[in-house]
């Protein structure tokens, strides 16, 4: 965080807006992908067991 604050103060208002938008988009994409992978693995195992029992 310290390095980013220093860059903002040097860059000014224009660079602040552009860099913040890119940082937020990149962070959201990375977090969503990581969380989806973990949840999908857990749900797949549970769905296979529950789905087979319910269908039979």
Curated annotation (Swiss-Prot):
Domain of life: Eukaryota
Modifications made to the protein after synthesis: P2 is phosphorylated in immature sperm. It is dephosphorylated in mature sperm allowing a stronger interaction with DNA.
Statement: the UniProt record of this protein carries the keyword Electron transport: no
Localization of this protein: Nucleus; Chromosome
Summary of the tissues where the protein is detected: Testis.
Region Disordered, annotated ranges: 1-56
Protein role: Protamines substitute for histones in the chromatin of sperm during the haploid phase of spermatogenesis. They compact sperm DNA into a highly condensed, stable and inactive complex.
Record's protein name: Sperm protamine P1
Organism this protein belongs to: Octopus vulgaris (Common octopus)
């Amino acid at each position: 965080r310290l390095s980013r604050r220093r860059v903002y103060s040097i860059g000014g208002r224009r660079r602040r807006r552009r860099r913040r938008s890119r940082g937020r988009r990149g962070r959201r994409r990375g977090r969503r992908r990581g969380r989806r992978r973990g949840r999908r693995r857990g749900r797949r195992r549970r769905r296979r067991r529950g789905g087979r029992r319910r269908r039979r």
